[in-house]
Design a protein with these regions (language model features):
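Preference for protein termini
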Residues: 1-479
């Protein structure tokens, strides 16, 4: 009876309606099964999963951790998060709406900027974004799609409402952990998995490959697609190699490719093979030393020439980072209204913008109450958690905001929903978010569920793996 001492606390709890044990109906089967197991059985299953992840190399890299080392398994919790069908349908609709609007925005700002001319978003906000690429002005990308793979992060507030926390439209990561989590759960709790009627996720690699092939500039029967990785020491290398293997395509580094006369080729033992589509897991800055950073050893000299001539496709497109910008994020609801004449299905978290004088004054006067974020940082870096910050940290961030107001946003602290999580020999609530993965090719495909990330440190709201977070399997139920 590991749940007997469980406390819901003053948060929205994914499993329990109240401290008295009133359970949401879609969790009743899981709770009944788990409650029948002695703690030793639950812990044994958890340990088997941890061991299998270690054996399979399901790891990520933490930069600068000299105490525990850089390579570690991605922490996983056995108790699944469950999303009923009706709830998931709304999430799907909201994410589809959002990725369409973001792609229309990117196409617009690189082709005349009507949304700017109509006063919806200031020109300076767009063109001062760190990842705005003037090289892409007037360039037509394949199928007019810029973001082919997206991972928008969702949270739930104290009333259980879903909110978009941020958009990841450059190189969203984490889907390999989602897929590995599912396989681990099917082995660990097969009876429970079958009993609930969980929607599968194992066609993701096929859908991703079809999305990439759809972008091919050549009308070849089998377009040549590759995954371009920075290499073995990148924090997400496990994912790069995993996805290439699952799709049945080559994983390459920049040195494995060569650009000749406006085309890109892969070096093989059989000679050069023309490449049609590159799923790049490298930021724009490092793609081509002839166009972006001259010191890049990760990219391919001449790649941008081939790309701009339409002879090779890149997923995601160059210049999508404008949509990743946390200042741009604040305007996405307006984009939805402007391009689609619809109200947002999933709302944003209220956001204060440092470049607006009134907002900046409010931010500086309420640093203790707010979460402050740098516009282009990720992974929990460049962030001030006001309620847990020191006076010195607040002074430092105030100085940063004054020096670079365009580069900072602030949001009220949203008490993320909590989910029962195994903590040693008992169960406690831990805060969670959700990263669903959206593919935009011939159709929009959203993988049922997503990666539920868990803040494993008690009381923490930071779920990022780089900051010690873990994950859960996410079960979307059939109707």
């Amino acid at each position: 009876m590991m749940f007997n001492s469980y406390e819901k606390g003053p948060y929205f709890d994914e499993m329990f309606r109240s401290d008295e044990g009133d359970t949401f109906s879609h969790y009743s089967t899981v709770l009944n099964r788990l409650d029948q197991w002695p703690p030793s059985k639950l812990l044994e299953k958890q340990q088997k999963i941890d061991s299998s992840f270690l054996e399979q190399g399901v790891t990520f890299t933490v930069t600068g951790d000299t105490v525990h080392g850089t390579e570690r398994i991605f922490p996983f919790d056995l108790i699944p998060r469950i999303i009923p069908d009706a709830e998931w349908q709304k999430i799907e609709q909201g994410l589809s709406q959002r990725i369409i609007a973001l792609n229309l925005f990117l196409n617009d700002i690189y082709h005349g900027g009507k949304i700017i001319a109509d006063g919806i978003i200031p020109e300076d906000v767009v063109k001062s974004a760190a990842h705005y690429r003037p090289e892409m002005v007037g360039v037509d990308v394949p199928k007019d799609i810029y973001i082919h793979i997206c991972g928008s992060d969702l949270i739930r507030d104290g009333d259980g409402n879903y909110l978009v926390l941020e958009d990841n439209g450059r190189c969203p990561s984490g889907v390999s952990y989602l897929l590995e989590n599912r396989e681990a759960m099917k082995r660990a709790v097969p009876g429970m998995y079958r009993a609930l009627g969980v929607r599968p996720v194992d066609d993701y690699a096929d859908l991703l490959r079809k999305t990439l092939e759809f972008l091919s500039p050549r009308q070849a029967q089998s377009p040549v697609c590759v995954v371009l990785t920075p290499g073995l020491y990148n924090s997400a290398y496990f994912e790069h190699s995993f996805l290439a293997r699952q799709m049945g395509i080559e994983i390459v580094e920049g040195r494995d490719l060569v650009a000749i006369d406006g085309y890109v080729y892969m070096r093989t033992t059989r000679g050069l093979v023309q490449v049609d589509v590159i799923y790049r897991r490298i930021d724009d800055d490092f793609l081509d030393p002839q166009v972006f950073r001259e010191d890049s050893m990760l990219g391919v000299p001449g790649l941008m020439d081939a790309y701009l001539k339409g002879n090779v496709a890149l997923a995601n497109a160059v210049g999508t980072g404008v949509a990743d910008d946390k200042v741009t994020y604040a305007y996405v609801p307006d984009m939805i209204r402007y391009y689609l004449a619809q109200e947002p299905i999933i709302d944003n978290v209220p956001t204060y913008l440092g470049w607006r004088e009134g907002d900046r004054r409010y931010i500086l006067e309420h640093l203790e109450e707010l979460v402050v974020k740098a516009a282009n940082e990720s992974g929990g870096y460049g962030m001030l958690m006001g309620p847990s910050s020191t006076k010195e940290e607040r002074v430092e961030f105030a100085q940063r905001i004054e020096a670079e107001p365009r580069n900072y946003v602030a949001q009220p602290v949203v008490s993320l929903s909590r989910h029962p999580t195994i903590c040693g020999d008992h169960i406690e609530g831990r805060h969670v978010d959700l990263r669903p993965f959206v593919l935009y090719g011939e159709d929009i495909e959203i993988i049922p569920g997503g990666l539920t990330r868990v803040a494993l440190t008690k009381g923490s709201l930071v779920v990022n793996s780089s900051q010690g977070g873990g994950s859960k399997d996410t079960w979307v139920l059939y109707q």
